Amino acid sequence: MRRSPDLPYIILFLIPALILIGIFVYFAVVWNIYISFTDWRGLIPSYHFVGLAQYKQLIHDPIFWTSLRNNLLLILLFVPGSLLLGLFLAILLDMKVRFESGFRTIYVLPFALSFVVTATLWAWMYDPSSGVLNVLFDKLGLDFLKSGWITDPKIAMYCIIIALIWQFSGYTMIIYLAGIRSIPIEQYEGALIDGASTWQLYRYIVIPQLTKPTLSAFVVLMVFSLKAFDFIWVLTRGGPGTSTFILAIEMYKETFAKTNFAYGAAIATILLLMALVVVLPYLYWSYKGEER
């Protein structure tokens, strides 16, 4: 194999980026893991190695288990909800509806907004006294549907999940629509000649070929559900009480509000391990797919 004459220049341009990534990503990760095995507490970096003490404390921390439960609830509802709604919207747009470009823009617009803007918008809609939802129910005479929404600890987490699905469905719709449009037209024509209905066309031709788009979107949604800090922080700040705490919020409060850096680092390490469980199989699958 001949070496490209541009290889030295490519390496030269990559070195600064690799140095920055090495310092601010990989070194930071290793340092965080090391700190999680110490007793660093307070602004002064004075600490001693204590082994698994921070992780043992996590096991007996009820807030940690509440946060973990909320993270799992977020994964179980937000991820499939975003995938299914995105697939539904993509199929609708693929049916050659009028003003497709306009509808596509409308569906994608929520994802183009920052999480802070979206959370602020939904906080206004969920406001118990003057929010759009309660005002609308009041005007329609449906007072029994009025609720405290994000101020009700029983449903606050579900309200957050609905808002997140609304924001991310446009992203999954674009992923699926691109996958659908990449299917060769000959497959559609062959199925139509065989007398396939529209439902059979999507069930047996389209959906089975959307594995790659589904996995790509799945990984993105999973990783976001583990670190959805800014959205939830703006919307509820983890409240009422700890009803909408997730691991990222507990990590933030332990690290910056309580200056318990070692404990916050232990929570961050747990988040890292959860993310690796999702990302590593995907990278392996992608690598094997390229080899084939």
Swiss-Prot record:
Disulfide bonds: none annotated. Gene3D superfamilies: MetI-like. One of its GO terms (cellular component) is plasma membrane. It is a multi-pass membrane protein. The chain crosses the membrane at residues 10-30, 72-92, 106-126, 160-180, 215-235, 261-281. It is found in: Cell membrane. Residues 68-284 form the ABC transmembrane type-1 domain. Its main location: membrane. InterPro entries: ABC_transporter_permease, MetI-like, MetI-like_sf. CDD domains: TM_PBP2. PROSITE patterns: ABC_TM1 (PS50928). GO terms for biological process: transmembrane transport. Keywords: Cell membrane, Membrane, Transmembrane, Transmembrane helix, Transport. It holds the Pfam family BPD_transp_1. SUPFAM superfamilies: MetI-like (SSF161098). Belongs to the binding-protein-dependent transport system permease family. MalFG subfamily. Probably part of a binding-protein-dependent transport system PH1214/15/16. Probably responsible for the translocation of the substrate across the membrane. This is Probable ABC transporter permease protein PH1215. It comes from Pyrococcus horikoshii (strain ATCC 700860 / DSM 12428 / JCM 9974 / NBRC 100139 / OT-3).
